[in-house]
Amino acid sequence: MTFFNRIQELKLLNESATEKDKQLVVIFGRRRLGKTTLLRNFAKTKDAFFFSCPISTASEALRHFQQQMADAFDEPILKKAEFPGWQEALEYLFETSIQRNIPLIFDEFPYLIKSVPGVDTIIKHLWDKNDKKIWIGLCGSLISVMQEKVLGKDAPLYGRRSEIMQIKPFTFHDISLFYPNSTFEDKALWFGYFGGVPAYAEKASSYGSPFESIEKMILNENGVLYQEPEFLVREELREPGAYFSILHSLASGKTRPNEIAQDSGVPHSGINKYLDTLKRMQLIERRVPITEKNPERSTKALYLLADNFLRFWFRYVFPNRSIIELGRGRQLLERFVKPDLDIFMGPIFEQICHQELNKNGKKLIGWEPLKIGRYWDRQIEIDIVVEDTLSQRVAFVECKWGKRVNVNKVLNGLRKKSDLITSYAGWKKQCYVISRSKTSNPNHIFLG
């Protein structure tokens, strides 16, 4: 994959490599976000040892490991001799790294933990007894394993990391760089269908339009992303069936635990356990109104899919796989996806507006946001609320994807709703509409 716009992450890696003390850097994030590409670019400039951990037996993994060391360190003897076990191999690696000042990178470290039980304990002992400078990067896509076996309080390596880097999807602004000659609408559609995953965007950008890309890549039994969500979920979970049903319910618009349980068929008594697991995997988000004083204990929490591609897949592909496998992806596109476009894109546009306010808030509303969220109660919902708690200023924002928007009508309704929120009594209030319509209203922000 092409290295693209991970400047801050690369800077952090380079800075940690210049530290005088030993460094253990943990890098994690879901599949296809460019972690390996980032680390390979870092490795190039540092002449680092890079080991891509295989899914295999301990003995086979050791053979791969020894071969990799022989090539990286230009030691022909390593190709002939065999280490008795992982303890000896890792001891040699540590000694060579310290002598030559070579950073060590273990990509997909969870696979090594699964293939070689106790390898994390070996690394821990070697780390603890060494007081010389060494740089180790442990990277993984299996978020549950990274959190439990590397970062968890019962993990052998707990408390030893110097840095934690969570690699996140690109924002709309950054992922749009993959589509430099496209219209705003097409960029938004691509973001809505493929999210901020650079590997998806790189492939999608090779097609002429967003609709062509989803038809070829997703709504096609042989498409490169047709089975992608199954890999994501099955790789980490033992009972994927219930989780698939929950993800489908979320993609269909169910947001509250009781709604999700009823729609998915998962017992109400167990739904929170499933939701917590999906949240730890960073597949879903738990959101509360911006005004909540104790978010963790809030009873107003909503759950939403954290990934646009998963939202598309579980909304359109999961319930219609039989249609796709009959070769009727084009019909699915014309009869279900396109007619549903404005409904599907509403939350996507809201997400884009949120990111735009976070990035360019001062330019758009005149001051720097300190906090951005949503508001809802039993009576009203407001798409975006922007706070400056220091100056007690607040901006209420409605986001409208449609091209024809009666801005004055939306603003009047927004002002009435904002007056009902008592949390901002005495604050300076502003109301805005963000849309793709063009108007001279000073409280309208054009995005398009």
Model-derived features: positions:
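Phosphate-binding site recognition
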Residues: 1-330, 334-335
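A cross-kingdom feature that marks ATP-driven nucleic-acid transaction machinery
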Residues: 297-448
